[in-house]
């Protein structure tokens, strides 16, 4: 499920999961003032891969193989998807925080496990778990049944509009559209409204009004108009959030693997942070996220305390 809270995390209460109902995953949305900085402009000229890039790809493959090996060894893939996400996400604790890993020219779907930001952390965790559940029966007899390509395919399905990568503007840049699109695809279910959520007046427009901060828009100015049209569509939809004052009241309903999004009041943006819930042995809903402040993937305090 995915849930939206106001005043802190920029996600709303919504269920994330696979189309098969038995594999559905949950997540929450929260809202709070944004303090993040913008993406610096960089040279987007296409270049051959450097040795550093090759090394990063090889290291990502090594990390991926280790995660899958541990998952199969401990049979995490047999758990409900939320619990599976919790186990997989916890394996990334300590991974350094690195932003901007998706900003490639030309656009391509990429997995980089050398460093994670708040979005790529939950994206990778979700899609490794989704793939594991899809491949669960095959993995029982063949430990090599789940490949890097399988996860990349699932990631493309959730990261891009209608599940198809077709250039920079097909990526779901705004979390609010990610939610809408993945609800439509049956990947997640938004529970924000039924859990007491309030209308959230999303008015995105930051990308089209600040193209200088996005290397791809600098390189291809004609894409800005497409982005503006996407923003107008997002703004015309209905969105919901859970006010901070109500978070503690619903905290007991959170489960391990629930994805959290934190809304922002920064002009032109919708959400500023994402993460997921880990329910500990005492039943406390802790916030697991890639923290820019801690500079790593970190298991934080109670979600209500985090938002306080």
Language model feature labels by segment:
Residues 257-308:
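C-terminal soluble interaction/assembly domains
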Residues 28, 72, 76, 80-97:
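Sequence/structural signature of beta-propeller domains
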Residues 48, 62-73, 96-108:
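Acidic/histidine-rich, surface-exposed loop or edge segments in extracytoplasmic proteins
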Residues 10-47:
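Bacterial Sec-dependent signal peptides at the C-terminal "C-region" and cleavage site
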Residues 223-253:
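Mixed-charge, Lys/Arg-rich low-complexity intrinsically disordered regions
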Residues 1-7:
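N-terminal Sec-pathway targeting helices
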Residues 92-235, 279, 283, 289-292:
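Acidic/His-rich structured neighborhood in mature extracellular/periplasmic domains
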Residues 57, 61, 78-86, 108-119, ...:
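Solvent-exposed, acidic/flexible segments
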């Amino acid at each position: 499920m995915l849930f939206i809270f106001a005043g802190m995390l920029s996600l709303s209460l919504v269920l994330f999961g696979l189309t098969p109902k038995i594999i559905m995953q949950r997540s929450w949305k929260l809202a709070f003032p944004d303090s993040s900085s913008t993406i610096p402009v960089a040279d987007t000229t296409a270049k051959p891969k450097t040795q550093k890039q090759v090394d990063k790809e090889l290291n990502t493959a090594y990390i991926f193989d280790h995660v899958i090996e541990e998952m199969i060894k401990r049979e995490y893939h047999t758990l409900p998807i939320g619990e599976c996400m919790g186990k997989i996400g916890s394996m990334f604790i300590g991974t350094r925080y690195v932003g901007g890993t998706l900003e490639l020219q030309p656009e391509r779907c990429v997995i980089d496990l050398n460093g994670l930001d708040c979005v790529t952390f939950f994206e990778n965790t979700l899609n490794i778990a989704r793939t594991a559940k899809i491949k669960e029966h095959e993995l029982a007899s063949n430990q090599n049944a789940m490949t890097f390509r399988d996860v990349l395919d699932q990631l493309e399905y959730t990261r891009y509009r209608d599940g198809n990568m077709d250039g920079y503007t097909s990526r779901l840049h705004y979390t609010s559209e990610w939610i809408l699109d993945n609800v439509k695809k049956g990947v997640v279910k938004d529970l924000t409204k039924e859990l007491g959520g309030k209308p959230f007046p999303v008015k995105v427009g930051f990308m089209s009004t600040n193209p200088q901060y996005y290397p791809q828009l600098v390189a291809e100015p004609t894409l800005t108009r497409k982005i503006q049209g996407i923003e107008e569509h997002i703004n015309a939809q209905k969105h919901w959030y859970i006010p901070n004052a109500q978070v503690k009241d619903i905290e007991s309903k959170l489960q391990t693997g629930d994805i959290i999004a934190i809304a922002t009041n920064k002009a032109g943006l919708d959400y500023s942070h994402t993460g997921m819930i880990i329910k500990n042995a005492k039943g406390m809903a802790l916030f697991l996220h890639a923290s820019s402040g801690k500079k790593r993937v970190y298991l934080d305090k109670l979600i209500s305390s985090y938002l306080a």
